[in-house]
């Protein structure tokens, strides 16, 4: 039915010259589709009836089989009408149908060109079959099948007439294309010309000649079996193509957009003078390929017509029945011509078969090469698969090893975390101990301040003792002087002075007790400080001062003894010895750093304690090698439990610290003296 509304002058269609007959054809096609929905009213005017979009929605539902949602069946204003048309255009765009210069506003305003373009786009895309076309094809097939050939001459005449008409139409198409190219200078319109395709020409010719042949029984419609066998498909194809090939510019635009042809991509309806961007060489190549395909099809058609002309049947029918070389009642010349034609036909068929055989052999070689290549590729892939399996195995082994390492590291991490927790606990304990020590340090500082006051008091008492000692020394000197004068008066006889000795001992007894009291006070003061307190140095200085005073007394007594050597042992010397014996064993030069009157029979001892940075020195009245640990303990006079280390020379290791445990063990010496370290065993 669309073929009717597209038949007209092509130039008028391109120039938008729509006549009343074409409009009626559009209306008739739309109404023919709307008949499938009896409830829908037929269309009278395309401008008014399709502008609301409802008829278009029904048309899409009929031709496409899809119902549009959201369509207002009774639009009351322009906005609802525009919404319906926009939904129709969205559906068309979803089907990849390109609608150039078509908008919902144009259709709502009644633009006839846009409405016709949309109708043709739907017809070109969905291709609904016309009932009349189907009925015509059915009637033509029935008539053709019922028509049987009469003789070979009639067949030949029909074929000759058909070929002549085809050649005439081809020449017409060439002239029409040339004239149209000169007028419009456009190539894509040439492709859309109704006389472009040879198949279309033959089909058009057969379609045009079929109706008069039915009435006049013309010989142009060949009643041969090949025509009856192929006409069915040819007629159907021609009728389907007739609906869409011969269409105006709107149909051209939609169909070429659907197929994706580059020749009509830039074409716009209403502008026939627009040129394409593609070059003429590409266009000519496409035309040449198209013509080659059409010529191949025409050649096959002519070959079939020739076989039908010579044999009166299809080539496959010839294989089923024997071929008669001589037919009775036929002119020998005609028979010879027919035989030669058959021979030529057989040779051509032989050549075609040879070509097909060579083609099959080439394809077989190609397939064999592809097979070999695939086999080689398969071998390579097998090798690659084996390598991948080996790599996978190695990767799994590495993974297991890494897992084991991870487990080991996790175990070590747990152990470290446990140790860290213990260290944190120890650190907390050390912090608490540090706080306790700080508290003790504050207490010791407080005691130190108290001790400083006690030290001042002791220094004051010491000064008093020094003054008292000086007075007593002066009194002793006076007594010695008086004694000497008295002895000279006695003419050298020494009288018993037991009473004086007793008096001297009586005077020195309190002096010895006072000295012991001072030493006890210093010892208690030293114990009140920590091991590294700087106040120990002050206490050591005080103790050294007291030792110096005692040393001076000892020097004075020594001088007195030397003066009395010539007189023998007098009661005064005996009293002095008794006074010396009344001192404690460790009072002999205690904690002195200098000893000006040390003889060879004494051993100098230098020792360090953990409570003082200053070393102490004492003299022991024994030779080096004879001094024992008991003598050393008696000399330093330290209370409590201690450990004693002495500097010694080892033949194997050199200079070492040797610890002595037993009191009877001899103490090693170092360069003529003894160097010792005294450590408090309770602190360790």
Swiss-Prot record:
Q: Which positions are tagged coiled coil? A: 277-308, 336-461
Q: Which residues lie in Polar residues bias regions?
A: 571-597
Q: Which CDD domains match?
A: CH_DIXDC1
Residue span(s) of domain DIX:
602-682
Organism whose genome encodes this protein: Rattus norvegicus (Rat)
Q: How is it modified after translation?
A: Phosphorylated on tyrosine and serine residues. Polyubiquitinated, leading to its proteasomal degradation. WNT3A signaling increases DIXDC1 protein levels by inhibiting its ubiquitination and subsequent degradation.
Q: Which family does it belong to?
A: Belongs to the DIXDC1 family.
Q: Does the keyword Cytoplasm apply?
A: yes
- State the GO CC annotations: axon terminus; cytosol; focal adhesion; glutamatergic synapse; neuronal cell body; postsynapse; protein-containing complex; stress fiber
User: Which cellular compartments is it found in?
Assistant: Cell junction, Focal adhesion; Cytoplasm, Cytoskeleton, Stress fiber; Cytoplasm
**InterPro entries hit by this protein:** CH_dom, CH_dom_sf, DIX, DIX_dom_sf, Dsh/Dvl-rel, Ubiquitin-like_domsf
Which GO biological process categories is it annotated with?
canonical Wnt signaling pathway; cell proliferation in forebrain; cerebellar cortex development; cerebral cortex cell migration; cerebral cortex radially oriented cell migration; forebrain ventricular zone progenitor cell division; modification of postsynaptic actin cytoskeleton; negative regulation of neuron differentiation
SUPFAM superfamilies tied to this protein: Calponin-homology domain, CH-domain (SSF47576), Ubiquitin-like (SSF54236)
What does the UniProt entry state concerning the protein's domains?
The coiled-coil domain mediates interaction with MAP3K4 and inhibition of AXIN1-mediated JNK activation through MAP3K4.
User: Under what name is this protein listed?
Assistant: Dixin
In the UniProt record, does the keyword GTP-binding occur?
Answer: no
Q: Which domain of life is it from?
A: Eukaryota
The record, for Pfam families, names: CH, DIX
Give start-end positions of Low complexity composition bias. Answer: 211-228
Residues modified to Phosphoserine? 186, 231, 592
**Function of the protein:** Positive effector of the Wnt signaling pathway; activates WNT3A signaling via DVL2. Regulates JNK activation by AXIN1 and DVL2.
